[in-house]
Amino acid sequence: MEEMPKTYDTAAVEQRMLDKWLEGDYYRRSAGVGDCTVTIPPPNVTGKLHMGHAMDDTIQDTFVRFNRMRGRSTRWILGTDHAGIATQTKVDKKLAAEGISRREIGRDKFIDACWDWTNEYGGFIVEQVKRMGCSVDFSDPHFTMDDDYAKGVRKVFCD
C-alpha cells in the first residue's frame, strides 16, 4: 500500500485537476435548451489579476455552472482589454527604467514594445483564470484589439 504523503502538494493537485478539465473540454459551449452566454468584463493587460477580479469571476462562474447544471447551453467567453493609455504608461515606465524613452525609439518600436507587454501580461492573466478553476471556454479567447472588436467599436462610436 502506498504511503500517504506528509504534506498536501497543492500545486500538483491543482495542475492535475486543471489538465483533466482542459483535456476533457468541459468548458466549451455545452449542449442544452436555452442559451446562457457571459462575457468576462475583460481585465486590462497592465498587470496581474487581484482579489476584485477573483470575486467577480467567482460570481460569474457560479452563475454559469448553475445554468449548466440546469441543462442550459452555456458559454463563458474569456477576454482581455488592451487598456491603451494605462499600457502606454506601464511601457513608458519600463523604458525609463532602461534609460530610454518612447520618443527615442520611435513610434513603430514603441508600438512593438506595447504589444510585447500585452502578450506577456495577457498570457499571464489567462493562466491566472485557469488556475482559479474558472469554467471559461478557453478555446476562443478575445482581445479588445482583435479586428472584429475594433470594427464593432468604430461602428458604434464613429459611424
List each model region and its residues:
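N-terminal, positively charged nucleic-acid-binding surface of large information/translation enzymes
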Residues: 1-159
